[in-house]
Regions:
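Conserved SAM/SAH cofactor-binding pocket of Class I
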Residues: 34-147
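SAM/dcSAM-binding transferase cores
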Residues: 217-260
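Short, structurally constrained coil/turn elements
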Residues: 10, 65, 93, 199-202, ...
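Mobile active-site "lid"/loop adjacent to the S-adenosyl-L-methionine
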Residues: 138-167
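SAM-dependent Rossmann-like transferase core, predominantly class I methyltransferases
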Residues: 4-45, 49-63, 225, 241
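Conserved Class I SAM-dependent methyltransferase catalytic core
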Residues: 21, 162-219
Length: 260
């Protein structure tokens, strides 16, 4: 049995429990949380779809949450949700950040979003007209695009299984309040699919930022901000370089990680 790891991830001395044999978060989750914080400014109710062990809710709450902010993380992996709940306890955030086990595909197809979860944060958001903010770092690879060559947990985190891209966006639109904001991280190769799905779900892309490994290279990550029922105008932010060309994190990434 794999020994569970307790990582000190920074951001106000946050701790995160992770199983090394399962999928562990990467830089894309961190930059998504920072991207959301820089645009949303704050929130009353937020949800993270496909939350894994909960790193995005913890970081975004640190960067943009307030005393009355509440976050709900949803994932279909019971083991990951168990670790996320324990991390919430370790960080003294049990009241502010809740986690629940459920399938995004079922949420996308359910008749009543309010009835999907009995959790207090979920019910509070639904009674408030929906979530103010939804974040998601969904699987990047479409169904049938690759042969499983890794552990089941890692494969499910990277490849669409039950819920596809449409399912994640339908679920987000279902639980957002009118003019609520979605923040998504994905691969540029899926950008056309993302925009088509967003428009079908009334999620209007408003802000986009490409992420490159180093300055001058092609982007391998894209950050997208959408507004439910928003007007048609798309703003491009300057590219974000992860590395500085010498193998170290760029100055902006170090600022995002709050190391400088």
């Amino acid at each position: 049995m794999t020994e569970i790891r307790t990582d000190d991830i920074g951001f106000g001395n946050l701790k995160l429990l992770q199983d090394p044999s399962e999928f562990c978060y990467g830089v894309d989750a961190v930059i998504l949380a920072d991207f959301a914080a820089s645009i949303c400014g704050g929130y009353r109710y937020a949800a993270d779809l496909g939350t894994g062990t909960g790193v995005i809710p913890f970081i975004l709450h640190h960067k943009a949450g307030s005393g009355d902010s509440r976050y709900f993380g949803l994932d279909f992996n019971e083991g990951s949700i168990g670790l996320a709940r324990e991390s919430s306890r370790l960080n003294g955030l049990c009241e502010q950040i809740h986690f629940g086990c459920g399938d995004i595909a079922e949420l996308a197809g359910c008749a009543s979003a309010k009835a999907f979860a009995e959790d207090g944060v979920w019910q509070g958001a639904m009674e408030n007209g929906g979530f103010d903010v939804v974040t998601s770092n969904p699987p990047y690879f479409a169904k049938g695009s690759a042969i499983p060559a890794e552990g089941a947990g890692k494969f499910r985190a990277r490849h669409e299984t039950t819920a596809d891209l449409d399912g994640f966006l339908q679920a987000a639109a279902k639980i957002l309040k009118r003019r609520g904001q979605l923040f998504l991280v994905h691969r540029p190769s899926r950008l056309v699919d993302i925009f088509e799905s967003c428009r079908r779900c009334r999620l209007e892309p408003k802000t986009i930022r490409f992420v490159v490994p180093e300055a001058g290279q092609a982007p391998n990550i894209v950050l997208i901000h959408c507004v439910l029922g928003g007007g048609r105008e798309l703003k491009y932010l300057p590219q974000l370089a992860v590395y500085d060309g010498r193998g170290s994190y760029s100055r902006e990434i170090q600022k995002i990680y709050e190391r400088i």
